[in-house]
Amino acid sequence: MENQPKLNSSKEVIAFLAERFPHCFSAEGEARPLKIGIFQDLVDRVAGEMNLSKTQLRSALRLYTSSWRYLYGVKPGATRVDLDGNPCGELDEQHVEHARKQLEEAKARVQAQRAEQQAKKREAAATAGEKEDAPRRERKPRPTTPRRKEGAERKPRAQKPVEKAPKTVKAPREEQHTPVSDISALTVGQALKVKAGQNAMDATVLEITKDGVRVQLNSGMSLIVRAEHLVF
């Protein structure tokens, strides 16, 4: 047991649990609601494995159940599961409402952070603009060279070195993407890209709805996107 590798972060613990209990935990895509009291089940089942402590398990569970993809899975009609994927009863309305509020608060925090970052960028740009508009120093007049006397020998001009023509830099080839023609062929957890102007952002399918496809970006933000904005 002493030779087992040690998991150093909650994300590594979650990845281990997803591999150890694939019918309960997932490393990507929408997560299933967990059985109440599953912490003690984990302690009993994985005690001593990978040198895991109770503190590590508790921290990993807290991170897992507060993630956006887990909160999306806590919805009316969803069923809790145990470590082996067996159903353990439907979610009650109180837990569904609590998850909805947590998700709204998390989104609000992300929006506030982005607004703060944008404000700092605008402030920095304004400061740089003020420096450019500052009055320039007056240049001193260049000294006049004395005129050559009549009859004096003219010095030969130094020849300028021949400048080499700059090498043309080839423009980078644009990455080719395949548009999504049929959203019904997509699956939850599938990786694809969302077009935003000339760029394409990586995303994961969370849910397929009548209005489009709900995806989650790498930043954690989720949104519903129509098929014409999805590519592989």
From Swiss-Prot:
Give compartment(s).
Cytoplasm
Q: What is the reported phenotype of gene knockout?
A: Mutation reduces both the rate and the extent of ProP activation by an osmotic upshift, but does not impair transcription or translation of proP.
Report a single Gene Ontology molecular function: RNA strand annealing activity
Output compositional bias ranges, type Basic residues. Answer: 137-146
**Which InterPro entries does the entry mention?**
ProQ (IPR023529), ProQ/FinO (IPR016103), ProQ/FinO_sf (IPR036442), ProQ_C (IPR035236)
Q: Looking at the Swiss-Prot or TrEMBL record, what is one Pfam family this protein matches?
A: ProQ_C
Q: Which SUPFAM superfamilies match?
A: FinO-like
On the tree of life, the source organism's domain of life is: Bacteria
Q: What is known of its domains?
A: Contains an alpha-helical N-terminal domain (FinO-like) and a beta-sheet C-terminal domain (Hfq-like), connected by an unstructured linker. The FinO-like domain serves as a high-affinity RNA-binding domain, whereas the Hfq-like domain is largely responsible for RNA strand exchange and duplexing.
Query: What is the species listed in this Swiss-Prot or TrEMBL entry?
Result: Escherichia coli (strain K12)
Keywords (alphabetical) are:
Chaperone, Cytoplasm, RNA-binding
Protein name per UniProt: RNA chaperone ProQ
What's this protein's function?
RNA chaperone with significant RNA binding, RNA strand exchange and RNA duplexing activities. May regulate ProP activity through an RNA-based, post-transcriptional mechanism.
Q: Its GO CC terms?
A: cytosol
Biological process per Gene Ontology, one example term: positive regulation of transport
User: Which residue intervals are annotated with compositional bias (Basic and acidic residues) in the record?
Assistant: 117-136, 147-177
Region listing for Disordered, in residue ranges: 105-182
Q: Which Gene3D superfamilies match?
A: ProQ/FinO domain (1.10.1710.10)
The record's comment on protein family reads: Belongs to the ProQ family.
